[in-house]
Structures are given as C-alpha cells and as structure tokens.
A protein has these predicted regions:
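Structural motif
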Residues: 80-81
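Mixed-charge (Asp/Glu-Lys/Arg
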Residues: 2-77, 86-88, 92-201
C-alpha cells in the first residue's frame, strides 16, 4: 500500500485551479488527477498504459524527463491513499477505488484520473504531511511511504473520516499519537473517556 501527497492546484490560472478542485473533490464522484491532456488526439487511448506511453514518448522527444506523478499513477492500486489540498488549504484524505484511467478534459488539463473515496480532514495534519505541500520545487507528488507513523496515521484518519474500518491500523508506541492533530487527540481522548465526540471540522 502506498501513501502519496499530490498537488491538484499547480496551474497559475485561478479559474482552472478552482475548476479542477471542484471536479476532483466537490462532486459526487471524486478523483485525483494529472494533466498532459495535449496528447489526446495523437492516437487512440484505451487504458492508462496507452496514455502513459504516449506522454513518456512526448516528453522524451521534447528532451524532458518523465514526471514521477505518471509512475505513481501507473503503480496505483485499490486502497492506496492520497493526501491533497483544496483552494482553502484544507487537507483531504483519499482512498483509491482502483487503478488510474485515462480521462480527457482539455479545459482543465486533465489527462488521467484515479477514482477515489475522499474526505475533508481540515487544516490540522502532522508536519510531515503539511511540509510535503510546502517544499520548494516539491513537484506534483511526494511519496510518504517511508514514515511508518504517517502511513498508520493516514490509515487511521481515513477510517475515522469514513466512519468504518477499511484499514487495520498497527499499534505504535507513542509514534501514532505524536502525529495526531490536536483535534484528533481530543477526539481520541473523548472516545476513551466516554465523553461526547466533538464535531469534525
């Protein structure tokens, strides 16, 4: 299972950014998406592998290295987790429902999507997650797999927001608690004390 930070709002055109965020996070069906919509029309694209190969060839011809986000989508499987943000800076946790698929929207520059189950988390997340969005030249995506605590936190947060246990969360000696936001620490304390649960932000 992979946990990845993905930026959805890289375009400088505010209308495009807003349209992309609305398409990905505000609809009944939610997605994480990447661009390269310009390659559509060059040849038939049946699946993500076709899309990937065409983009890779196009980038190579233009003397560019392939963007790592393309490989991330190629490797995505059901139950992989993504962290993203909306235009208000709110964090979202998203679970992949399956593999990446080609989807063309030239106006929003969408070339491929991963259908997801996504939930608003709020403004407070561990520093390792928030920091990954603020890195200079951080790119479209960053893998968060190396930090075991972040993987477990991400699974915990998805379960919490979904209201069901999709993931088994491993018990960690203090590590998981160190990564909880103050709101989630309070919620956890309330659950264990029998007090009413606070409303989610």
């Amino acid at each position: 299972m992979h946990v990845t930070r993905i930026n959805l709002k890289t375009d400088k055109d505010m209308k495009k950014r807003e349209g992309l965020i609305n398409f990905c996070l505000k609809g009944e069906i939610k997605y994480v998406a990447i661009g390269w919509s310009h390659i559509y029309g060059t040849r038939e694209i049946k699946d993500y592998r076709d899309y990937y190969d065409i983009v890779k060839g196009s980038e190579k011809r233009n003397g560019k290295r392939i963007n790592s986000a393309l490989n991330t989508f190629l490797d995505t499987k059901a139950d992989d987790l993504f962290w993203t943000r909306d235009l208000d800076g709110m964090y979202w946790i998203c679970r992949a429902k399956g593999e990446a698929i080609p989807k063309c929207d030239k106006e929003l520059d969408i070339g491929a999507v991963v259908p997801v189950e996504g939930y608003l988390v709020g403004l407070e997340v561990p520093g390792q997650i928030s920091g990954s969005f603020n890195r200079v030249n951080g790119g479209i995506k960053q893998s968060l797999d190396k930090e075991k605590e972040i993987v477990e936190y991400s699974k915990y947060m998805f379960n919490s927001r979904a209201g069901r246990n999709v993931y088994e969360v491993k018990k960690m000696e203090g590590g998981l608690l160190n990564n909880l936001s103050s709101f989630d620490l309070e919620e956890l304390a309330r659950k264990n004390s029998g007090l009413p649960i606070a409303e989610k932000p």
